[in-house]
Swiss-Prot record:
The complex is composed of six subunits: RnfA, RnfB, RnfC, RnfD, RnfE and RnfG. Keywords: Cell inner membrane, Cell membrane, Electron transport, Membrane, Translocase, Transmembrane, Transmembrane helix, Transport. Its EC number is 7.-.-.-. It is found in: Cell inner membrane. The keyword Metal-binding does not apply. The chain crosses the membrane at residues 5-25, 39-59, 62-82, 102-122, 134-154, 171-191. InterPro entries: Ion_transpt_RnfA/RsxA, NqrDE/RnfAE, NqrDE/RnfAE_oxidrdctase. One of its GO terms (biological process) is electron transport chain. It comes from Sodalis glossinidius (strain morsitans). This is Ion-translocating oxidoreductase complex subunit A.
Length: 193
């Protein structure tokens, strides 16, 4: 049980997918202008990353490895992610049309989010078992969502702040992301992974 807690904390804080591994930067910068959209995107990505990591583990261990075709991993994982994203898009469209409109083009773009493919491939490289794979996917998504919501809240504050003209827009956003990354580096010694 302690190992699973360390995996969760390590993935969310110490090895954060956005600020440490630099995966998922496109939605991090693109959807983080408002907290509502960042939260919605975070929830959708959490669902997709968790489900995709579970499906990827199942496909890898029960199809790719027994048939001795591990070279098809990337292609199979991309297909799995595309199917999971389409399922998520249908669910969000039916359950929350307002969120579906807010997320717009970014919902189908979860398919191309490198963090989703990254979690599936890293699960295989780390030789996680089924429970560890599910927890790793969920933890990576929680870390992604946490950083996106925090970044969106900071960007909302910066939108009304008196920022010097050369730093307005993307410049201050990148500086803020860098400072957040430095802040998360403070968690480095928290967990040995």
């Amino acid at each position: 049980m302690n190992g699973y807690l360390m995996l969760f904390i390590g993935t969310v804080l110490v090895n954060n997918f956005v600020l440490v591994k630099f995966l998922g930067l496109c939605p991090f910068m693109g959807v983080s202008k408002k907290v509502e959209t960042a939260l919605g995107m975070g929830m959708a990505t959490t669902f997709v990353m968790t489900l995709a990591s579970i499906c990827a583990w199942l496909i890898n261990d029960f199809i790719l490895l027994p048939l001795n075709i591990p070279y098809l991993r990337t292609l199979a994982f991309i297909f799995i992610i595309a199917v999971v994203v389409q399922f998520t898009e249908l669910v969000v469209r039916k359950t929350s049309p307002a969120l579906y409109r807010l997320l717009g083009i970014f919902l189908p773009l979860i398919t191309t989010n490198c963090a989703v493919l990254g979690v599936a491939l890293l699960n295989v490289n780390e030789n996680h078992n089924f429970l560890q794979s599910a927890l790793y996917g969920f933890s990576a998504a929680v870390g992604f969502s946490l950083v996106m919501v925090l970044f969106a809240a900071i960007r909302e504050r910066l939108a009304v702040a008196d920022v010097p003209a050369p730093f307005k827009g993307s410049s201050i956003a990148l500086i803020t992301a860098g400072l957040m990354s430095l802040a998360f580096m403070g968690f480095t010694g928290l967990v040995k992974v």
